[in-house]
């Protein structure tokens, strides 16, 4: 837990930090990448790097740069055009980051990910190893979504979500999301001049979504996506700071403890590596709607999910696939590796353990999902 002492946050002990910088902070009013701005960010990142922090950078800006290079007046809305813009702009984005970091004798590495890379266990572990090697070599990974090959089914959707997933993957001590807003307000400051900036909130507080607003022209993420990302990072035990990138030397100042932005705290212990991989599944093979008793058993008692607690089986999945468990309102409770196919799950849903044997006529696990193979939300 990050402490606040004498009006300052104790962030200096956060060694491994994922920093996400939004499009509006990297582009010149929509006129392509802003070299001066990126050089300014490189200086701040270099200062943290040289102070011993391990920085993983998630950088937006590829689509915005591609739009300028192709002389497009507005952001494309269809996926193929977005993919083409990203492919064109990514060349300029990574070249710029590499050049400005080289000015500080720091090497950069390009890492492109899709959700499918993290959902596949082998690729997830491979990317973990690659990122760890880069960190060990004191190279700064510059991460972006691999828009060119992503489809709607395997997209993160925005770099806020990607940053949260990476924070869990690398066991980060802190996620910093830099945006054009000061942080989280108790109401939309664009419509309420009396809106107050929240200094510290709990990432799990549902009321936060009611306070969030929409996104800008060049980026995909508004405050809603940032709140969702903070909650996702919190599931891995990683706190999130959302702050304005327009504040002078914001990275150095927040790491020195200055109370800028909004800190999203977590009261969850860090998940195991296997649980973090499970939590990385934004899309799953199927869904189990569970009753209130099962929700309580999972969330409060950390029990396995038994067939008796399952009300509805949705989707087609095989034994060992990752599925999500939701309550009767559709809110995600957990994700886990299921011990039965969707066909068998449909047969045994709602049955007590003694009847499962009778119906299936074979000895097998009594749990629909064992607690050791479950990530709780």
Swiss-Prot record:
GO MF annotation terms: ATP binding; glutamate 5-kinase activity; RNA binding
UniProt main location, coarse: cytoplasm
Record carries keyword Iron-sulfur: no
Major enzyme class: transferase
Binding site residues for substrate: 60, 147, 159
Keyword Kinase: yes
Catalyzed reaction equations: L-glutamate + ATP = L-glutamyl 5-phosphate + ADP
EC number: 2.7.2.11
SMART domains linked to this entry: PUA (SM00359)
Any one GO biological process: L-proline biosynthetic process
InterPro entries listed in its UniProt record: AceGlu_kinase-like_sf (IPR036393), Asp/Glu/Uridylate_kinase (IPR001048), G5K_ProB (IPR041739), Glu/AcGlu_kinase (IPR001057), Glu_5kinase (IPR011529), Glu_5kinase/COase_Synthase (IPR005715), Glutamate_5-kinase_CS (IPR019797), PUA (IPR002478)
Associated pathway: Amino-acid biosynthesis; L-proline biosynthesis; L-glutamate 5-semialdehyde from L-glutamate: step 1/2
Keyword annotations: Amino-acid biosynthesis, ATP-binding, Cytoplasm, Kinase, Nucleotide-binding, Proline biosynthesis, Transferase
Superkingdom as given in the UniProt entry: Bacteria
Start and end residues of each PUA domain: 285-363
Pfam families recorded: AA_kinase, PUA
PROSITE patterns listed in its UniProt record: GLUTAMATE_5_KINASE (PS00902), PUA (PS50890)
Compartments, as annotated in UniProt: Cytoplasm
Residues that bind ATP: 20, 179-180
Family: Belongs to the glutamate 5-kinase family.
Stored NCBIfam families: proB (TIGR01027)
Biological role stated in the UniProt entry: Catalyzes the transfer of a phosphate group to glutamate to form L-glutamate 5-phosphate.
Record protein name field: Glutamate 5-kinase
Lineage: Bacteria, Pseudomonadati, Pseudomonadota, Gammaproteobacteria, Moraxellales
Gene transcribed to yield this protein: proB
């Amino acid at each position: 837990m990050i402490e606040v002492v004498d009006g300052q946050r104790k962030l200096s002990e956060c060694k491994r930090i994922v920093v996400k910088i939004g499009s509006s902070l990297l582009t010149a009013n929509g006129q392509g990448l802003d070299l001066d701005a990126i050089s300014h960010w490189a200086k701040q990142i270099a200062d943290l790097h040289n102070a011993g922090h391990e920085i993983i950078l998630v950088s937006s800006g590829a689509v915005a740069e591609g739009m300028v290079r192709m002389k497009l007046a507005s952001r494309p809305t269809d996926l193929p055009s977005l993919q083409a813009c990203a492919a064109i702009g990514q060349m300029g984005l990574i070249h710029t980051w590499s050049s400005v970091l080289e000015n500080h004798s720091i090497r950069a590495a390009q890492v492109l990910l899709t959700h499918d890379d993290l959902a596949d266990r082998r690729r997830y572990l491979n990317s973990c190893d690659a990122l760890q090697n880069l960190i060990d070599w004191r190279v700064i990974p510059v991460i972006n979504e691999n828009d060119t090959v992503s489809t709607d089914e395997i997209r993160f959707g925005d770099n806020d979500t990607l940053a949260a997933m990476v924070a869990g993957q690398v066991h980060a001590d802190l996620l910093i999301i830099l945006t054009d807003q000061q942080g989280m307000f108790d109401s939309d400051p664009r419509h309420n001049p009396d809106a107050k900036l929240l200094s510290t909130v709990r990432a799990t507080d549902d009321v936060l979504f009611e306070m969030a607003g929409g996104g800008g022209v060049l980026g995909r993420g508004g405050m809603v996506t940032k709140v969702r990302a903070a909650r996702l990072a919190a599931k891995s035990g990683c706190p999130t700071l959302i702050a304005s990138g327009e504040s002078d030397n914001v990275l150095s100042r927040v790491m020195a403890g200055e109370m800028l932005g909004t800190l999203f705290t977590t009261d969850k212990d860090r998940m195991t590596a296997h649980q973090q991989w499970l939590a990385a599944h934004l899309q799953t093979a199927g869904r189990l709607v569970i009753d209130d008793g099962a929700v309580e058993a999972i969330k409060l008692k950390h029990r396995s999910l038994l067939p008796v607690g399952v009300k509805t089986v949705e989707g087609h999945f095989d034994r060992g696939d990752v599925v999500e468990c939701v309550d009767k309102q559709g809110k995600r409770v957990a994700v886990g590796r299921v011990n039965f196919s969707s066909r068998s799950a449909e047969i045994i849903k709602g049955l007590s353990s003694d009847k499962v044997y009778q119906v299936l006529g074979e000895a097998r696990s009594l749990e629909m999902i064992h607690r050791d193979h479950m990530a709780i939300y």
